């Protein structure tokens, strides 16, 4: 155990590679970071290295337009927040704030109960 540099006998396959004893990088690969010697990606300072995509922060439509009451009879407005499958679209997709999302879902449910909005899509 004192001598780590032992000479090994040739393997049955005929090819022999010296082992470093550790779990380091393979012999043929260059050392360095995840990109090796290539350097940074060209382009902007985005997460993915230059993708030209800017996502606007979603704002609540009801807060911007100063709509206080969400009317259950306004089918055109409520229909914007209902998917084709009939599900209420979540606020992370629409950008509606929490208090307005609660009022919106109550108005959609009320409109469904009096048959102004369908519960599910008509296939």
From Swiss-Prot:
The keyword Ribosomal protein applies. Pfam families: Ribosomal_S18. One of its GO terms (biological process) is translation. GO terms for molecular function: small ribosomal subunit rRNA binding; structural constituent of ribosome. InterPro entries: Ribosomal_bS18, Ribosomal_bS18_sf. Residues 20-34 have a biased composition (Gly residues). Residues 1-52 are annotated as: Disordered. Keywords: Ribonucleoprotein, Ribosomal protein, RNA-binding, rRNA-binding. Residues 1-10 have a biased composition (Polar residues). One of its GO terms (cellular component) is cytosolic small ribosomal subunit. The keyword Ribonucleoprotein applies. Binds as a heterodimer with protein bS6 to the central domain of the 16S rRNA, where it helps stabilize the platform of the 30S subunit. PANTHER family: 30S RIBOSOMAL PROTEIN S18 (PTHR13479), SMALL RIBOSOMAL SUBUNIT PROTEIN BS18M (PTHR13479:SF40). Part of the 30S ribosomal subunit. Forms a tight heterodimer with protein bS6. Belongs to the bacterial ribosomal protein bS18 family. This is Small ribosomal subunit protein bS18. It comes from Koribacter versatilis (strain Ellin345). The lineage of its organism: Bacteria, Pseudomonadati, Acidobacteriota, Terriglobia, Terriglobales. The gene is rpsR.
């Amino acid at each position: 155990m004192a001598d780590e540099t032992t000479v090994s006998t040739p393997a049955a396959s005929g090819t022999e590679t010296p082992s470093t004893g550790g779990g380091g990088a393979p012999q043929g690969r260059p050392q360095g970071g995840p990109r090796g010697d290539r350097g940074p990606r060209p382009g902007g300072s985005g997460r993915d290295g230059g993708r030209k995509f800017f996502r606007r922060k979603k704002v609540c439509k009801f807060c911007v337009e100063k709509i206080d009451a969400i009317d259950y009879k306004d089918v055109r407005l409520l229909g914007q927040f209902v998917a084709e499958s009939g599900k209420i679209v979540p606020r992370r997709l629409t950008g509606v704030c929490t208090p307005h999302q609660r009022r919106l879902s109550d108005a959609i449910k009320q409109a469904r109960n009096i048959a102004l909005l369908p519960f599910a899509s008509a296939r």
